């Protein structure tokens, strides 16, 4: 995260929540404590969604939920070919079905963030396809359905 701090400067902080299977291997150095905040593995990821301005993810499905917030999502997949061919594969066409391009290097990722390079129309298209029922009135629809006279 030293490169991230150098590139992003004082304008950003990172809320870091690694996968629960590898979280015990991470330690944030003391001189990065005011830049990288380690999220407890037991803490609900939804808490992070509420306080974040953007999401950086790899292969996690968290982007489906986060997309509904209408905020930038960056896909950092430095090992894309290995993951696709030898590990798990995908349930979507990557990168075509994603709400943003895939980047494979830290340099590309940091440049996209610094340049505020995000295609909001692509995100809207993604949400129309994968989150079509999220129109801000879910509670109203539930109450109407439960208490309808018919």
Predicted features along the sequence, with ranges:
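Acidic, amphipathic alpha-helical patches
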Residues: 45
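Catalytic binding pocket for nucleotide-activated donors in carbohydrate/polymer assembly enzymes
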Residues: 27-32, 61-130
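PLP-dependent class I/II
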Residues: 10-13, 54, 118
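C-terminal alpha-helical cap of glycosyltransferases
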Residues: 135-150
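Hydrophobic/aromatic beta-strand patches that form the interior of the parallel beta-sheet core
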Residues: 15, 37, 54-56, 74, ...
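Catalytic donor nucleotide-activated moiety binding site of glycosyltransferases and closely related
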Residues: 1-40
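Acidic donor-binding loop of glycosyltransferase active sites
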Residues: 50-61
